[in-house]
């Protein structure tokens, strides 16, 4: 009987320790250092995510909180926060558990495009990255050497994680709509979320659009992928804004 109790206690301790991790892998990789970074672990729709204070990824926020948080947050793409985040430096520390963190180097040359919608703003940012073989969950805190929160994990491409901050090319559209991601069609001429086989067909489409415009808040932000990625804002079929993006990864995984 004692053996069973001891086994149960060991399993409970292991489960408790696992629950405090902000990585999915058990064996930590990279440069691991002793560092205490607070975080709370949550679960929504069967997926774990973390938060630190008021800071959490927008795409993890429960729907009933979106409108409330959008009114009061500072506008970092992909991140809700009631406080200003610490500025980005050359080094950062990414939380592994309550006692350890991975030391990483910020890469400003390799950038990931992240987008977010909170019901008020549709934001985009060409974010710097860090590389790690660890499998972090969304919301994992990223801090500077003094423990100030720089950002939280939002998205990645393979082993490269985006670091959302005020650094990097970015902006926003005032829109209540979510981003629409469009896969590029082979050849043709892009306009908003559509692709036309010829310039003549494109001109005919534009000429046929009605003169009046709907409410600006109904405009749809569009991300077109491919080798020549671009952003657009579309209202009633009319392209109101169009941005070409260069040297940025757009095919990313939101955690």
Curated annotation (Swiss-Prot):
<dbReference type="GO" id="GO:0061507">
    <property type="term" value="F:2',3'-cyclic GMP-AMP binding"/>
</dbReference>
<comment type="similarity">
    <text>Belongs to the poxin family. Highly divergent.</text>
</comment>
<dbReference type="InterPro" id="IPR006853">
    <property type="entry name" value="Poxin_vir"/>
</dbReference>
<dbReference type="GO" id="GO:0004518">
    <property type="term" value="F:nuclease activity"/>
</dbReference>
<keyword id="KW-0378">Hydrolase</keyword>
<comment type="function">
    <text>Nuclease that cleaves 2',3'-cGAMP.</text>
</comment>
<protein>
    <recommendedName>
        <fullName>Poxin</fullName>
        <ecNumber>3.1.-.-</ecNumber>
    </recommendedName>
</protein>
<keyword id="KW-0540">Nuclease</keyword>
């Amino acid at each position: 009987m004692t053996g069973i109790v001891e086994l149960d206690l060991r399993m409970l301790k292991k489960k408790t320790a696992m629950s405090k991790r902000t990585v999915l892998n058990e064996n930590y990789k990279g440069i691991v250092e002793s560092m205490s970074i607070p975080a709370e672990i949550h679960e929504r729709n069967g997926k774990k995510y973390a938060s630190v204070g008021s800071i959490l990824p927008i795409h993890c926020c429960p729907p009933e909180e979106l409108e409330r948080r959008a009114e009061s947050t500072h506008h970092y793409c992909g991140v809700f926060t009631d406080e200003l985040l610490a500025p980005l430096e050359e080094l950062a520390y990414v939380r592994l558990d309550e006692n350890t963190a991975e030391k990483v180097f910020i890469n400003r040359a390799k950038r990931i495009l992240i987008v977010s919608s909170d019901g008020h703003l549709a934001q985009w940012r060409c974010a710097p990255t860090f590389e790690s073989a660890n499998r972090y969950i969304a919301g994992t805190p990223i801090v500077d050497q003094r423990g100030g929160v720089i950002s939280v994990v939002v998205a990645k491409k393979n082993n490269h994680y985006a670091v959302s901050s005020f650094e990097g090319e970015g902006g926003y559209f005032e829109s209540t709509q979510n981003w629409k991601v469009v896969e590029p069609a082979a050849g043709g001429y892009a306009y908003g979320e559509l692709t036309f086989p010829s310039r003549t067909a494109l001109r005919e489409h534009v000429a046929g659009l009605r003169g009046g415009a709907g409410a600006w808040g109904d405009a749809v932000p569009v991300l077109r992928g491919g080798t020549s990625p671009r952003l657009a804002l579309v209202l009633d079929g009319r392209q109101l804004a169009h941005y070409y993006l260069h040297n940025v990864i757009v095919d990313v995984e939101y955690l």
